[in-house]
Amino acid sequence: MAANSKTAIRLSLRAGERIFINGAVLRADRKVSLELLNDATFLLENHVLQPEDTTTPLRQLYFAAQMMLIEPAMREQAGATFAQMLKGMFAMFKDAEILNALKLVDELVHNGRVFEALKTIRAQYPREAELMGAQPVVWPVTKSGKSAGANP
């Protein structure tokens, strides 16, 4: 997510939790609150998709978009991969809900709002699973009672 200079963004991290900020990986050694005061691109650890979890087209698209956030040196290459994948998805998907979400994702990424695009993609995981005949992924609940996965 990009913090803008007009509004500070406050984040709370648990002990051991990681956050990716402008390509750097930080780990909290104890519960901590952070306030980002200027422009920064960040992604919380529980929103980071691992390569082995890119098992569906939308998860592969998410991974390409996430790389634009957490690997600034690869942003151009990841952006090209993302654009190519997105184009293929417009041809592959026939479902209006997913197509509308993909149009929004395209617009968000084009406007530099990659974090919001990631949220939009995650929101379509259940629909994609439904269309593929699989059960939607149910994210485990952490000890705090919050979902550890898809939607913040």
Swiss-Prot record:
<dbReference type="GO" id="GO:0006402">
    <property type="term" value="P:mRNA catabolic process"/>
</dbReference>
<comment type="similarity">
    <text>Belongs to the FlbT family.</text>
</comment>
<keyword id="KW-0694">RNA-binding</keyword>
<dbReference type="Pfam" id="PF07378">
    <property type="entry name" value="FlbT"/>
</dbReference>
<comment type="function">
    <text>Has a post-transcriptional repressor function in flagellum biogenesis. Associates with the 5'-UTR of fljK mRNA and promotes its degradation.</text>
</comment>
<keyword id="KW-0678">Repressor</keyword>
<dbReference type="GO" id="GO:0044781">
    <property type="term" value="P:bacterial-type flagellum organization"/>
</dbReference>
<protein>
    <recommendedName>
        <fullName>Probable flagellum biosynthesis repressor protein FlbT</fullName>
    </recommendedName>
</protein>
<keyword id="KW-1005">Bacterial flagellum biogenesis</keyword>
<dbReference type="GO" id="GO:0048027">
    <property type="term" value="F:mRNA 5'-UTR binding"/>
</dbReference>
<dbReference type="InterPro" id="IPR009967">
    <property type="entry name" value="Flagellum_FlbT"/>
</dbReference>
<dbReference type="GO" id="GO:1902209">
    <property type="term" value="P:negative regulation of bacterial-type flagellum assembly"/>
</dbReference>
